[in-house]
Amino acid sequence: MNALTGVLSDLDRVLLSAEDIHARVADMAKQIERDYAGRLITVVALMDGALFFVADLLRQIDLPIRLVTLGASSYHGGTQSSGQVKLQWPAGVSFTGEHVLLLDDILDTGLTLTALHERLSAEAPATLRTGVLLNKKRPRAQDSPLDYCGFEIEDEFVIGHGMDYQGRFRNLPCIGILKP
């Protein structure tokens, strides 16, 4: 019996299979390698949601990488963004003159990505690009900078492959919609 059978039974439906995710992440890695050829990339990864996506992506990039993790969230335990972004910035880390790639799991309201992009821009990196595994098709109050996108999805609350509901379901190999 598969150890995830019980967890998978909590899904209403699978949106993206593990195979779909793996193939798309490999394509994203190739594009990033082309764009950053010959450079050290400083990857800024948003935890905890981007953990699985970032781990999968970085293992496929054949370039030197410096990894910095940040805590940032606008959900705070629910299924809707609170509208308030909480940042946990690392002490003593500078991004000045670096080639920075900001990675997150999902672009939803755009608040988190925009806030972090502005904060990183203020540190005068040589370049600053952003990437997400998922981009929700939804209206946003402001455009969010986005250079790399795995998948465009409808405006639904998703779980799996690092994304959670109240701390659960991150370990799902697929991305799905939770049963109501």
Model-found features: residue ranges?
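PRPP-associated nucleotide enzymes
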Residues: 1-180
